[in-house]
From Swiss-Prot:
The gene is secA. Pfam families: P-loop_SecA, SEC-C, SecA_DEAD, SecA_PP_bind, SecA_SW. SUPFAM superfamilies: Helical scaffold and wing domains of SecA, P-loop containing nucleoside triphosphate hydrolases, Pre-protein crosslinking domain of SecA. One of its GO terms (molecular function) is protein-exporting ATPase activity. Zn(2+) binds at residues 1002, 1004, 1013-1014. This is Protein translocase subunit SecA. Its cofactor is Zn(2+).
């Protein structure tokens, strides 16, 4: 019934395309009219459109004319030489109808799925121009700095021709230049640069002038699935060094390496013993087995099952599992042990190992044998206490019940217990991360070693991520494992996920070649529809059926054979691999067989542009990781299309169908011919971990001769099912991340709003007074609950609390009056503290010499000091809160064992923590406002002028007496999408008036450096 209606009325997708096609026709009509306009008349359209918008017209009404203007400009640029990335390129592009169609979809907040070579970059110019007419911020998000710079210089020419300004936001742009770039009508940049600038504006800027961004109106995300799907689980983090790091990786690494070696040796022995029995059985034949041998055979298969749990990548195990009968026998043991009645026996069997590795779940578990070995065989490194956490509550009770201790001794003992508990937890955490580094993180798959540093490999793109670090101490654990220098521990200063960052935009859209498989996720999380845009020319690519082999060895032999045959015809070949390790293995095979080739992986990423430029040439063979699978445009050398075009081979099916489609899309661009084929083995991770167990029975029936591919419809379906299973798992993880970050996001918005209010308000004094009043009110609520309850009305306690917070004197019976209500008490306290604050401000302001005020120095430095104190306290306590939230996130995962929902627990406790932060923040800000002092320099104005110093106004600084050190500024140096490091500037003495460099000669004429002379400021 529904199919019949669909044929009559078309799908929603078809109806939308038809509606947009009518708009394309309007665009073309206007384009015809505009061809008669002069250049000046065409350029004047921008001002005309802006005026019409101001007069009430809507963007949708302007769309046909605006898009037609862009199309007309592109036509007039034909033949123009444009300088792009150091080279001159000739403009030869005018948008096709399908590109106009994609531009309409993006303006309407959809994701345009456009095939390789269909001109996504030019398509984006039309909606960028239209939305930039509003004067609001318009951003084009790219996947790397090179594309941001290139697109700004290349297609940005159209926007500049029409009078708009453009800017390229790359990692190399200095902080002081960024505000100017953000003032541009259209800004090109990477997601990480936009995200880090947002974090810096809201967590590091000390004034409104320091903030660079101007809002979030419209964004188009290039390769939107890569950024919003693949990168969604990777938060942007600005981090800095931990002042008191407790890391023990150096101390523990030898012991962990020994434990892992013992596990490996144990599994190798088990596998070797099993192989001997299996070979003996095979030599005798199935008809000559006695009962004892049959028992030995079953025991051998049990050992192999155990080896799979201890070292899943064991070479002996992998070789034996090439035989479908042995694979089936091992699977039988797996089914046996998963039966409910055999759970206890399974536990006893696994206890033979030191540790159990769950390769599919990417987890591990230490057994009792492993714990005992850690204590016994690690040369005194291991300790029983490494796996026993203290119960601080019980320990505190014991201290309180110890009558031999006085109050001071009890407090000291509790501090000692707290310190010991923190040390134990840190040691246990370091131990867990070292084990994870050894058991679950693989060199040349998850990371490479470059310049004696650990460099992460992006699992989706295959590109190296220099500067990015694994979080939670894992990166340091890998550094310890590989014997490179262990970098300092860091803590989070500010963080946000890309999901929540991009959801701040008023309008969001995107473009990619592969989005339909994730359409539901785009709709559910980002409210974005996916629209497939037809191709300009028919796609001539031929996708061959997959070739499936039993073993990797057979698969590689088949690839070698196919490469030789295709190479003889001089067709270019691109071979896509999943990891650096596989690309290097294939390279060795090709070298041994005399095939000249080029390798592109994370170790050769500097040569990417050069290698891709050569990949479309006659007889070229290119082995590449996923780096060549997205965003690269391989152009064919003249004559290659006649040979059949580029031949793309995949060495495995990836866990995501989008990655496979991206690899296929490297060939047959813009109507060129091309072929693609995937080669798969049952040793590939996808099939080994996620394929249906029924495959084993199929293999036993259809096992082909050595070297022959397996052909069975069920296998192809099973591969697709496995991919869907992985995609669903990853989607669940991304959604899980978002649910937790949504809690953080609400808190982040509250803190950043409070911080921006402090920065934006002209006069900080009313804000300071409001904070003092709220603190006095919070204290009153604590000490004045009820007159009828014993201890419920405590005026003396309130007075002592106020004296502890503020340097203000309250008479002994100031609040101890029968007629006073709590509101009156609050007001009395607040009035007295506010009066003291005003006196403090007036006193500090009076310290500024009159001649400095005449030179332009602020007459109210105390206001600046208070503002800076508020900002610094907010930042400091927010950073501490983030650390507590990280710990909470780790802790709540264990609540699932007690049948409690971790997310619900997280929300509940996160709210309590934030409520505590809000109260403590106001209290600390109120306290700190009385603990600063303005210190003016002793030099005379004449001395300063004689020294020829440059005068800087509005630089009033202060000494924070509470911390007994000058304030510090911190600057972020972001290099990556995941982590950025904070550098702390050395603290400088705080002065009012013109600044003198610390290493400059002192203007007093002593001949000494300023830092050794008059710059010495004592804090009284």
């Amino acid at each position: 019934m529904f199919g019949f209606l669909k044929k009559i009325f078309g799908s929603a997708h078809d109806r939308l395309l038809n509606r947009y096609r009518k708009q394309v026709e309007e665009v073309n009509k206007w384009d015809q009219k505009f061809q008669s306009l002069s250049d000046e008349q065409l350029k004047a359209k921008t001002a005309e459109f802006r005026l019409r918008l101001k007069n009430g017209e809507m963007l949708d009404q302007l769309l046909p004319e605006a898009y037609a203007v862009v199309k007309a400009v592109c036509r007039r640029l034909n033949g123009t030489e444009i300088h792009v990335s150091g080279y001159n390129q000739r403009w030869d592009m005018v948008p096709y109808d399908v590109q106009v169609l994609g531009g309409i979809a993006m303006h309407n907040g959809a994701i345009a799925e456009m095939h390789t070579g269909e001109g996504k970059t030019l398509t984006a110019v039309m909606p960028l121009y239209l939305n930039a007419l509003t004067g609001k911020p318009v951003h084009l998000i790219t996947v790397n700095d090179y594309l941001a710079q290139r697109d700004c210089e290349w297609v940005g020419t159209v926007l500049r021709w029409l009078g708009l300004t453009t800017g390229a936001l790359t990692n190399s742009v200095a902080i002081e230049k960024r505000k100017e770039i953000y003032e541009s009508d259209v800004v090109y940049g990477t997601a990480s640069e936009f995200g880090f600038d947002y974090l810096r504006d809201n967590s590091m800027a000390m004034s409104k002038e320091d903030q660079v961004q101007r809002g979030y109106y419209f964004a188009i995300i290039d390769e939107v699935d890569s950024i919003l799907i693949d990168e969604a689980r990777t938060p942007l983090i600005i981090s800095g060094p931990v002042p008191d790091s407790r890391q023990m990786y150096d101390e523990l690494k030898e012991g962990v390496a020994e434990l892992v070696r013992r596990q490996r040796d144990l599994c190798n022995r088990l596998a070797s013993d099993a192989r001997k029995v299996v070979e003996e059985v095979e030599a005798l034949g199935s008809g000559k087995k006695d009962k004892k041998l049959e028992e030995s055979e079953q025991e051998a298969y049990r050992k192999l099952w155990l080896v799979g749990k201890g070292t899943p990548q064991n070479k002996i195990l992998k070789r034996l599992k090439e035989n479908p009968d042995i694979r089936a026998a091992i699977d039988k043991w797996d089914l046996y042990y998963h039966a409910e009645q055999n759970k206890e026996e399974r536990t006893q069997t696994l206890a033979e190992l030191y540790m159990i590795i769950d390769e599919k779940g990417n987890e591990y578990e230490l057994t009792d044998k492993g714990i005992n070995a850690w204590q016994t065989y690690t040369n005194g490194i291991g300790s029983p206490e490494d796996f026993i956490m203290m119960d601080i509550g019980d320990e505190y009770i014991k201290v309180d019940e110890d009558l031999s201790l006085d109050a001071e001794s009890k407090m000291a003992r509790k501090m000692q217990i707290k310190e010991e508990d923190a040390k134990r937890k840190e040691r246990a955490h370091n131990l867990r991360q070292l084990l994870r580094a050894h058991l679950l993180m693989e060199k040349d798959v998850d990371y490479i070693i470059h310049d004696n540093k650990i460099v992460i490999i992006d699992e989706n793109t295959g590109r190296p991520q220099p500067g990015r670090r694994f979080s939670d101490g894992l990166h340091q654990a890998i550094e310890a494992k590989e014997g490179v220098e262990i970098q300092k521990e860091t803590q989070t200063y500010a963080t946000i996920t890309l999901q929540n960052f991009f959801r701040m935009y008023e309008k969001l859209s995107g473009m990619t070649g592969t989005a339909t498989t994730e359409a539901n996720e785009f709709k559910e999380i980002y409210k974005l529809d996916v629209l497939e845009i037809p191709t300009h020319r028919a796609n001539r690519r031929v996708d061959f059926n997959d070739e499936i082999y039993m073993t990797e060895r057979e698969k590689y032999n088949a690839i070698l054979k196919e490469v030789r045959e295709v190479h003889e015809k001089e067709r270019p070949i691109l071979i896509g691999t999943e990891s650096v390790e596989v690309s290097e293995k294939l390279s060795r095979i090709f070298k041994q067989n005399g095939l000249e080739h080029t390798v592109l992986n994370a170790k050769q990423n500097e040569r990417e542009a050069e290698i891709i430029a050569e990949a479309g040439k006659r007889a070229a063979i290119t082995i590449a990781t996923n780096m060549a699978g997205r965003g690269t445009d391989i152009k064919l050398e003249p004559g290659v299309a006649d040979l059949g075009g580029l031949y793309v081979m995949g060495t495995t099916r990836h866990q995501s169908r989008r990655t496979d489609r991206q690899l296929r899309g490297r060939c047959a661009r813009q109507g060129d011919p091309g072929n693609s084929k995937f080669y798969i083995s049952f040793e590939d991770a996808l099939l080994r971990l996620f394929a249906s167990p029924r495959i084993t029975s199929v293999l036993q029936k259809f096992r082909p001769p050595e070297g022959e591919p397996i052909s069975a419809g069920m296998l192809n379906k099973s591969i697709e099912t496995a991919q869907k299973r992985v995609e669903q798992r990853n989607y669940t993880m991304r959604k899980h991340t978002l649910e937790y970050d949504d809690v953080m996001n609400k808190q982040r918005q509250e803190i950043y709003a409070f911080r921006n209010e402090i920065l934006g308000v002209g006069n900080i004094e009313p804000v300071a007074i409001e904070i003092i009043e709220s603190v006095c009110s919070m204290g009153a609520d604590q000490f004045f609950k009820s007159r009828s309850e014993e201890g419920g009305w405590n005026p003396e306690g309130y007075r002592q609390w106020l004296l502890h917070l503020f340097p203000v004197t309250f008479d002994e019976y100031f609040f101890d009056k029968e007629h006073l209500e709590i509101e009156e008490i609050e007001q009395m306290a607040a009035d007295k503290v506010v009066e003291a604050l005003k006196e403090k401000i007036a006193s500090e302001n009076a310290k500024v010499p009159g001649h400095l005020i005449a030179m332009g120095e602020s007459p109210f430095p105390a206001h600046t000091a208070i503002r800076n104190l508020m900002i610094r306290k907010t930042d400091q306590m927010w950073q501490e809160h983030l650390l507590r939230m990280d710990h909470l996130r780790s802790d709540v995962t264990l609540r699932a064992v007690g049948q409690r929902d971790p997310l619900t627990e997280f929300k509940h406790e996160a709210f309590a923590l934030f409520d505590e932060l809000s109260r403590n923040l106001r209290t600390e800000v109120a306290r700190s406002m009385f603990r600063f002092e303005i210190i003016a320099p002793q030099q005379t104005l004449e001395q300063l002028l004689q020294s020829g110093l440059r005068l800087e106004t509005n630089r009033s600084l202060f000494v924070d007496l509470q911390n007994e050190q000058p304030s510090q500024e911190m600057a972020a140096d972001e290099e990556t999408q995941e982590e950025s490091k904070i550098e702390e500037n050395k603290p400088e003495p705080i002065v009012v008036g013109p600044r003198v460099g610390r290493n400059d000669l002192c203007p007093c004429g002593s001949g000494k450096k300023f830092k050794k002379c008059c710059n010495k400021v004592e804090i009284v």
